[in-house]
Amino acid sequence: MTVHVALGTDIIHAHPQASGQNLGKVSYHDFRLFCSMAGELDGGGVFLNIGSAVILPEVFLKAVSVVRNLGNRLEEFTTANLDFIQHYRPTQNVLKRPTQNSGQAIALTGHHEIMIPLLAAALKASLEASDARPRGARLNRSSKQ
């Protein structure tokens, strides 16, 4: 988990003991960590933006740009935006721009309290199904048994 603080956006920033220096320092550390994780999406990774309409879509697009501008390959991954209303920034910065040359983008519109448990159940079922097959086993798609 990473935290990307937008100074002045949370009530705690007005507290006399809040340290802009410390918040900035750990946010920068987390951005670098996030860039490293974004680089691991290449070749089949999945990035989910769940309910963030402004900050995370911007951070994600910048992380993708950092990875690519450093000369690293970042293609063939999937992005998904889950929200009850599709907004401009997630559509552009999560779905369209990062995957425009390769990859897949999925927009799921609905209530989080319904979609997230359904997504978790689907992932769990998929993992259980893959664990049921012996390692190295392939599905036999021919009609011969």
What are these regions (language model features)?
Residues L33-S36, G43-V46, A53-K144:
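C-terminal functional extensions of proteins
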Residues T2-A6, F47-G51:
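Short, conserved beta-strand edge motifs with alternating hydrophobic and charged residues
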Residues M1-V3, S142-S143:
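Short intrinsically disordered, low-complexity coil segments enriched in acidic
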Residues H4-A14:
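Active-site rim beta-loop-alpha module in soluble metabolic enzymes
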Residues S19-N22, G51, A107:
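Conserved short-loop catalytic and cofactor-binding motifs
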Residues I12-A18, L61-K62:
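Glycine-rich phosphate/pyrophosphate-binding loop at beta-loop-alpha junctions
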Residues V3-A6, Q21-G39:
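A general structural motif
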